[in-house]
Amino acid sequence: MIPKEKMRLDVKWATRQRLQYIEIMAWYAGVVARSDVARAFGLSDPAATKDLKLYSDLAPGNLVYNHSVFGFVPGEGFSAVFADLAPAAVLPVIAANLAVANGPYGATLIYGLATASLPLPARLPGQQTLAQITRAIHGRRKLRVGYRSLSSRDSPAARMIEPHTLVDTGLRWHVRAYNEESCDFRDFVLSRITAAECLDTPAESSVQYDDDWVEQVSLRLAPHSGLDAVRRESLLLDYGASGDLIEVNVRRALLGYVLQRLNIDTTPDHSMNPNAFQLMLLNRDEIEPFAGWAFR
C-alpha cells in the first residue's frame, strides 16, 4: 500500500486546489457540502463527490459527515493537510472570492511583473477565533465574544453579537455585527476579539435591517483648493473624474474608513495641509451624521 504522505505529495495541482478549498470551507464555514465544491469549480456532483472521498482517504478523520447539515464538518482532531489556514493567508482569499490560497509558484513571477505591498503591522485574530467568527457568519448564528474596546481599560467585556460581514479597510479587518447589548449594528475589530464561540442559536437580526450597511451615499470630492491648477488637474486625471468633481458611492457604514484611507480634508474651511490632504470633501453636512468620528 502506498503511504498516505506519498499519495498527498503526488496529488496534481488542479486536484490539490480543490482539496485546499474543501479544507478551508470545512474549517472556516464549519461545513463543506458536495454542492459547495461543485459550485466553486464548475464540477458535476459525481466529480465533487469523488474529490470529497479523495480528501477523506488522504486525511482520515479530518471530516465527519453530519446528516443535520447535509455536509462534512471538521472532526475532533482536525488538522490542515493541504491548506494554510492562518488568517493572514485565508482572509485575502475570502476577500477576493478565490477558491485557493498559496499557489505552487513560490517567488516565481508567473506574469513576469514585480509587485510590492506596504509592510503594515498584522492586526489579525488567532486561527481558532477567526474560525468561530466565520462559522457564525456562514451559519447565521449568534456569537459570544470577549472584546476589548479602545475606550475600556478593564478586561475584555463579554458580548453577544450577530455578525453578517467581514470588512477589510486596507489597514485592518473588522466584522459588522448586531450588538445585543446596545441593540444596534456596530464594527468589531478582529484583533480586539480575545475569544469567540459560535453558538447553535440562530441569529435574530439580518443584514437587511442594518440600515447603514444597506444604504449608500455619495462622497463628493474635489482636488484641494490649496493646490495649484496643474496639480488639481493631475488629481482629477488620477481619480478618473469626468469633470471637476470626484464622486464615490459608499455604504454609510464605511464612510469614515474611506475618508481616512483617502486622507480627505473634512474641515469646514478646508484648512488642512493640501500636500498631505490632497482631496477635500464638498458635502460635509450630508456625510458627517454618518461618520462623525472621522471628521476634524
Predicted regions: what they are:
Residues 1-84, 221, 272-296:
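Short, basic/aromatic recognition patches that contact phosphate-bearing ligands
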Residues 27, 98-112, 226-236:
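Short, compositionally biased low-complexity segments
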Residues 55-58, 196, 261-265:
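Conserved short hydrophobic interaction patches
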Residues 69-71, 172, 245:
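A generic structural signal for beta-strand entry/edge sites
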Residues 112-230:
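Core beta-strand-centered patch of the WYL/Sm-like small regulatory domain
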Residues 214-296:
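Polybasic (Lys/Arg-rich)
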